[in-house]
């Protein structure tokens, strides 16, 4: 399970996966509201990860464990 660092740049959210030296813009988040944040996350370029939903929108930057699952 890679550690993904999420950070905001202006109005965009970016994800950095150190193990792959990859940084990409987040284009979709399954849960992105005041009560819950996370779930299936789609990155620019087609990669998808799953982050266990957090209680509310986190303060960025934040490091979270993610799984890469081709079935999501």
Swiss-Prot record:
It comes from Klebsiella pneumoniae. The gene is nifT. InterPro entries: NifT, NifT/FixU_barrel-like_dom_sf. The keyword Signal does not apply. This is Protein NifT. Keywords: Nitrogen fixation. The lineage of its organism: Bacteria, Pseudomonadati, Pseudomonadota, Gammaproteobacteria, Enterobacterales. One of its GO terms (biological process) is nitrogen fixation.
């Amino acid at each position: 399970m890679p550690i993904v660092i999420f950070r905001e740049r202006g109005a965009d959210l970016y994800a950095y996966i150190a193990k792959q030296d990859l940084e990409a813009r987040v284009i979709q988040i399954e849960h992105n509201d005041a009560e819950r944040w996370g779930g299936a996350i789609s990155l620019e370029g087609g990669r998808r990860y799953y982050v266990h939903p957090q209680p509310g929108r986190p303060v960025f930057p934040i490091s979270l464990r993610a799984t890469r699952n081709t079935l999501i």
